[in-house]
């Protein structure tokens, strides 16, 4: 799964991805669950979700969509999370972000296909080291424009 996610971040998202140890530790501590999509014994997608009492949050999702289009790996990964939320008695499934309103964004279109409500609760940003933050913003812009 991490290999599929890494390739997605390298080729399309074009931003740094947390190291694999982040994901392993979240799993070991019981913070995250991994929902894997397999086809013929091979992992072709999946998601990492985190939950509280009423909401399941889809932190990461990926799939080999071009290569395995007849299996719909990204759709199945998200659907698995929605099923987990329902089975756990959660009332919400948060797909974590839909981009800026009015700016074309394929991910938002994908998420909208599942129905539900588009809700913006806002994001909070506390910059502890402004110069380092500005440097990081510049580096991410460079990576995205490659």
Enumerate the predicted regions with their spans:
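Conserved acetyl-CoA-binding loop-helix of GNAT-fold acetyltransferases
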Residues: 69-85
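Active-site/acyl-donor-binding loops of N-acyltransferases
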Residues: 90-146
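Alpha-helical elements of Rossmann-like donor-binding domains used by nucleotide-donor carbohydrate transfer enzymes
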Residues: 3-4, 21-22, 76-80, 106-109
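Short, charged helix-to-loop "capping" segments that act as catalytic/coupling loops
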Residues: 63-71, 97-104
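Short, high-confidence coil segments that cap the C-terminus of an alpha-helix
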Residues: 32, 87-90
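Polar/charged side chains located within well-ordered beta-strands of beta-rich proteins
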Residues: 47, 58, 78-81, 111
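A conserved beta-strand-loop-helix scaffold within acyl/acetyltransferase catalytic domains
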Residues: 1-70
């Amino acid at each position: 799964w991490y290999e599929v996610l890494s390739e997605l971040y390298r080729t399309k998202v074009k931003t740094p991805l947390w190291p694999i140890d982040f994901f392993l530790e979240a799993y070991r501590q019981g913070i995250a669950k991994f929902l894997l999509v397999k086809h013929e014994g091979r992992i072709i997608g999946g998601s990492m979700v985190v939950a509280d009492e009423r909401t399941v949050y889809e932190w990461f999702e990926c799939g080999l969509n071009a290569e395995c289009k007849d299996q719909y790996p990204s759709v199945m990964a998200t659907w698995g999370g929605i099923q987990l939320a329902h089975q756990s008695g959660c009332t919400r499934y948060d797909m974590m972000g839909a981009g800026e309103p009015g700016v074309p964004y394929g991910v938002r279109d994908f998420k909208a296909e599942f129905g539900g409500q588009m809700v913006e609760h806002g994001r909070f940003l506390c910059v502890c080291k402004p110069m380092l933050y500005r440097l990081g913003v510049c580096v991410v812009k460079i990576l995205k424009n490659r």
